[in-house]
């Protein structure tokens, strides 16, 4: 049973947009079977599916079986330093999913 949502960032610079397909390629290049996250939230707020939610994620050792992994694009400022670059859409989606206890 999945009872936890884990939110990750893509650790990419502010303003650089990437897709779930891009992240899938990065993960495959690192030896994953496919993208490790269940959902990706792009800069414009578009939510793209990643790994099917019926499958365990590959995003947080020890928590993959019981969690949904969400990755938002960003996490670094334009100079490459860590920064909270979450968009309003990202905050709203993750907050609603957690509050409602819905299946994301």
Locate the predicted segments by residue:
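Conserved residues at the C-terminal ends of beta-strands
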Residues: 8, 73, 104
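Glycine-rich phosphate/pyrophosphate-binding beta-alpha loops
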Residues: 58
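Long, well-ordered alpha-helical scaffolding segments within enzyme catalytic domains
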Residues: 16-34, 66-95
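Generic short alpha-helical hydrophobic face used as a protein-protein interaction/packing hotspot
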Residues: 11, 43, 74, 98-99
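Short, conserved "active-site rim" segments that organize catalytic pockets and cofactor/ligand binding
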Residues: 1-55, 64
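Single conserved hydrophobic/aromatic residue that forms the stacking wall/gate
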Residues: 93-104
């Amino acid at each position: 049973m999945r009872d936890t949502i884990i939110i990750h960032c893509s650790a990419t610079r502010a303003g650089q947009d990437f897709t779930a397909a891009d992240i899938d390629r990065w993960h495959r290049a690192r030896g994953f079977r496919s993208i490790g996250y269940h959902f990706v939230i792009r800069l414009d707020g578009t939510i793209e599916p990643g790994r099917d939610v019926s499958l365990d994620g590959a995003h947080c050792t020890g928590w993959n079986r019981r969690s949904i992994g969400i990755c938002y694009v960003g996490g670094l400022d334009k100079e490459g330093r860590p920064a909270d670059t979450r968009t309003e859409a990202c905050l709203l989606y993750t907050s609603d999913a957690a509050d409602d206890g819905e299946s994301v």
